[in-house]
Amino acid sequence: METEPLLGRRSSSWQKLAAEESRRSDSSGPRSSSSRNSSSSSSSQLDDLYIQQAAVFIEDAIKYRTINHRVDSRSLRLYRWYYSAACQWVLNTAILVILALAFFEKPSSLSVTSDLRFRQVLWEPPCGLTEGIEAICLLLFIVDVVVKSYLLGWEEFQKSKWLIAYTLVLAASTVDWIVSLSLFCEERIRVRRILRPFFLLQNSSLMKKAFKCLRQTIPQITSVMLLLALHLLLFTMIAMLLFTRVQVGYFHDEVTVIYLMIPAYSRRRAYSLFFIAFSLIGTYLLMNLLTAIIYNQFRGYLLSSIQTSIIRRCLGIRGAFEVLCCERSNKTGRSGSLRVTVSTNTVLQVLQKVKMSSAHKQEIIKQAKAFTHDCVTAEQFRALFDELHKETVKEYPPKPAYHLLFLQKLQTVFSHRFVEYVGNLMVAVHLVCIFVALVHDAETPISQRDGFFSGVVNGSFVLYYLLEMALKIFAFGIKGYCSYKSNLFDGLLTIILMILQLSSLVQYGLPRRGWNPELHGLLSLWETVRLANMLIVFRFLRIIPNIKLMALVATSLFDLIKNLRAFAGILVVAYYVFAIVGVVLFKDKIPPPQNSTNASLTANISPANLTLQCGTYEQLGYWPNNFNDFAAALVTLWDLMVVNNWQVFLDVYSRYASPWSKLYFVAWWLVSSVIWVNLFVALILENFIHKWDRSYHPSFSDQESEYQMSVQDMFRDDLEEPTEEDLLERLRQHPHLHLPRGPV
């Protein structure tokens, strides 16, 4: 039960309170004064509650959170505490800790190497240590689900599949934890380890949307997968018929097309047509068709999910306006039918309480103060928060003012873009000189090299970089110089280069013919020069912002890193689950070789499984790639994802474990190399296309902006904002907020 009356009830209660106050105002004396003080106190509490509700709704809109939570004063305080930075940090830390336990639990990953020939575990945790840490994390998660359930209420809890699943996962993990302790940590299969990635998944709304889109996309691509399976079946049957008389031993072991094609082509020219047709249809037609379908289907489902986020933002902003209108109607003592405007001062009070970025807050407050009237309409209130979608253009400090005309002209010259172009040209010339020196000394032993050319060139260019830095500080001032990220990058590298050059001069003196001193101090001359050359190569990156297309690619890359967090999180979940399952299925299945320190483990292995045939696991020396612990399993899965060596692992685990182990590797191939890689390509395309379109927009073309594009911003042009009627209807269906039903 809520401790405060709901909004609809407060409106009627306030009218009764106002009527009672008017009756008592006719009387005089201390009783009348106390009544007015009591009414004033109640009014102040209501106004504070409305402002608090509006601030929370706006914060929900900024973070794309639902507003269907409790709105009484106590619940709002709990709500803001739950979403505070400290509370979320504790929750995220608990998720990180419980995921990291897999590295320390049996089988422990605390060994110098995962190589089967030399692997020796340094330390195994005693029973109860990791379980105790896990219990603390589970208790935090239980508190988390209890707080969420209370804030949403029972009705919303029943509608939330994620909260129900969260509760079930916690219950299963707790039961499995109790079973582990009762068996003294000796059980082989721990179900809760497979369930742990769910805690990471449910903590991110964007990750949940991406997962939902993945789940809905998979059935759509089954037709292409069936076509791909039919393609494999058809060509397998043709190969069995075609190569029946040709005794080709490698055909039963190799699966890479080119390795099969070359020996077959040496026997008969026509055999190459089979392999060309197989790779052309499978690799270039069906796989690219699969990429297109995954991109199209996932983009459609992601659009629908992002549409929900846009509705949440609009609903939060409109909900804040509606509760502020109730506050205004209570002040005037009128019914809710006149809730059309909000006082500007009230809006400013709300904005001061909202937790948001300082740049956006300052701009929104500036826009609110610019209103000519004292009242803000719903449309104006919504327009205020359009600033959240706009680029925040960085304002630079003013240039220093010089009184002498000569200094003013110098300032104009050295603050021009021409100085940047000259600087880029000088860095390019410096790189050419370094390249010439490296080519010249490539075949010369270090003891016979002459450092005169490199020393003179590097010293001269470092002096130029210092001069360029000083002139920019003169033109822009120290604050203006430091306000540009490119200047900070150049200045830092220039200072490091100057320190290296000075240390070289102090230790080895000035460059001269035949300059090749011995080692003195921490670095030799050649190591100092090599480090300086590496920094100069990094300094050449300053050219990126000055080339439009290159800058576009670079900014797309940085935005991609930010927006990939949700999709990378899903990949982490997949890695975690497959690694745990791999450890359960394949731990200690592959024996170490006979001449290793762990050779005693091979005593019970059939000699038929041991082979040094070319291209096998044993012959290639893949001993570090195994599933004997969690860390080794992660690395093995990564190798399978990025390296085309599937046949090696399919062969070895079919021999030592079971032929059915191939299903595990095929499933990982579908998840990693087919689905996730194609989603990665789709996100790159969306990000780059959106950046390309914006790069030709006339606004902000010549200004440096502090804009980081989110996934919602990427798809904003393809989304529709809800109508006012739709928003009001959704607000009236709020389980804890009862607005008046008067006309707007």
Outline where the language-model segments fall.
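Non-transmembrane regulatory loops and terminal regions of cation channels
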Residues: 1-136, 154, 183-186, 206-460, ...
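Cytoplasm-facing ends of alpha-helical transmembrane segments in multi-pass membrane proteins
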Residues: 139-148, 183-207, 466-472, 530-550
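C-terminal ends of transmembrane helices
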Residues: 145-158, 469-482
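Cytoplasmic-side transmembrane-helix entry/capping segments in multi-pass membrane proteins
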Residues: 159-168, 483-492
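Membrane-interfacial alpha-helical segments at the cytosolic side of multi-pass membrane proteins
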Residues: 173-178, 496-505
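C-terminal "tail" modules appended to repeat-scaffold proteins
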Residues: 485, 495, 730-731
